[in-house]
């Protein structure tokens, strides 16, 4: 499972990624990752493209924009994990224990990344 936020913006509120047909570049990386033909940086929330892992030929996307696009902000993700916990709690005992364990594993990794 991969999650992509096509709508991340910089400090000036400009989109970091050009979108539209260029999204195929990211989808290509995902397919190649699933095939095991490209590497990835492991993070608490999943694998991210390595520097240069997504073909940027012909695009006006700086390395700084790519850094921002792939940046994991632990506190933001920890807030997301709290929301996931509340959501799962609403389903009571019907939620498989493995989902609770995975959420906790991700949260623990994020706390470690945040230095706490």
Regions found by a protein language model. Give the residues of each.
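Flexible, glycine-rich loop/tail regions that form catalytic "lids" or insertion modules at the edges
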Residues: 1-116
């Amino acid at each position: 499972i991969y999650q992509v936020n096509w709508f991340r913006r910089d400090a000036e509120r400009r989109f970091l990624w050009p979108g539209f047909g260029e999204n195929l570049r990211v989808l290509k990386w995902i397919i190649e990752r699933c095939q095991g033909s490209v590497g990835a940086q492991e993070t608490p929330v999943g694998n991210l493209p390595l520097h240069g892992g997504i073909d940027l030929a012909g695009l006006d996307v700086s390395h700084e924009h790519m850094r921002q696009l792939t940046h994991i902000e632990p506190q933001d993700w920890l807030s997301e994990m709290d929301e996931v916990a509340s959501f799962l709690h609403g389903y009571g005992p019907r939620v498989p224990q493995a989902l609770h364990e995975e959420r906790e594993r991700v949260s623990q990794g994020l706390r470690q990344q945040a230095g706490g």
